[in-house]
From Swiss-Prot:
Assembly and interaction partners: Interacts with GvpA.
Function: A minor component of the gas vesicle, might be involved in nucleating gas vesicle formation. Gas vesicles (GV) are hollow, gas filled proteinaceous nanostructures. During planktonic growth they allow positioning of the organism at a favorable depth for light or nutrient acquisition.
GO molecular function (one): structural molecule activity
Subcellular location: Gas vesicle
Protein name per its UniProtKB record: Gas vesicle protein J
Residues covered by region (6 X 21 AA approximate tandem repeats): 121-245
Length: 248
């Protein structure tokens, strides 16, 4: 009998070729169609669960995954160069923002430091001006009778009513600046000439009255004065004698 060895070899080669093509086709189909592996793995001892693992595995080609809407590797900075650029730009923007905030804080702090001395200077100026100009003191004074300097004779009486809205007096070099005051004079006797003898009744409003005092006199202070009887200076030929009565 003749051996049949060559026939067996040819059949083997045919079988291997068909098996190789079958595996390639299977892998291509799997990648083209896609395959999902899902399962749970749990390890427990004596009804006590120690480890629990859930597996969700997808095996497919890149094109098939994109068709299914899976493209997470494009946003992964370790797998995509575009994502790495975005991460670098984000870091640069954060550094710029921090530098701008630091500059803004420095500018605001410097502006606050500059405003503080200005407020202090204004307060010093106000203090100096207040020290130069004394504050007015409202003190009511009631004068019932006052006799002025006269040379002699009986002076004529002049009944007047005055409201002095502004009273300023100039003092010596040691005294302070003049201060406005309000004086109400109910009865006033003015200077008369040698020929005048009859009393005159009048009402006068004096808006600005200035009087000079001697160097040794103190500074005037704003006050409210009510004079009921006042006798002024008369001429040399007319003598006068009036008893003064002052109530302060």
């Amino acid at each position: 009998m003749l051996p049949t060895r060559p026939q067996t070899n040819s059949s083997r080669t045919i079988n291997t070729s068909t098996q190789g093509s079958t595996l390639a086709d299977i892998l291509e189909r799997v990648l083209d169609k896609g395959i999902v592996i899902a399962g749970d793995i749990s390890i427990s001892i004596a009804s006590t669960e120690l480890v629990h693992i859930r597996i969700r595995l997808l095996i497919s080609s890149v094109d098939k995954a994109k068709e299914m809407g899976i493209n997470w590797w494009e946003s992964d900075p370790y797998l995509s160069t575009k994502a790495q650029r975005l991460v670098e730009e984000n870091q640069q923007l954060q550094h710029r923002l921090e530098s701008l905030e630091a500059k803004l804080n420095s500018l605001t702090s410097s502006s606050v430091k500059e405003e503080i001395p200005l407020a202090a200077d204004v307060k010093d100026d106000l203090y100096q001006t207040s020290a130069k100009i004394p504050s007015p003191v409202d003190t009511p004074i009631e004068v019932l009778d006052f006799q002025a300097q006269s040379s002699g004779g009986t002076p004529p009486y002049v009944n007047t009513s005055m409201e002095i809205l502004d009273f300023q007096a100039q003092t010596s070099a040691e005294s302070s600046s003049p201060v406005g005051s309000t004086v109400e004079i109910l009865d006033f006797q003015a200077q008369t000439s040698e020929e005048s003898s009859s009393p005159v009744v009048s009402t006068v409003e004096i808006l600005d009255f200035q009087a000079q005092t001697s160097e040794e006199s103190s500074s005037p202070v704003g006050s409210t004065v009510e004079i009921l009887d006042f006798q002024a200076q008369t001429s040399e030929e007319i003598p006068s004698s009036v008893d003064p009565a002052i109530d302060v």
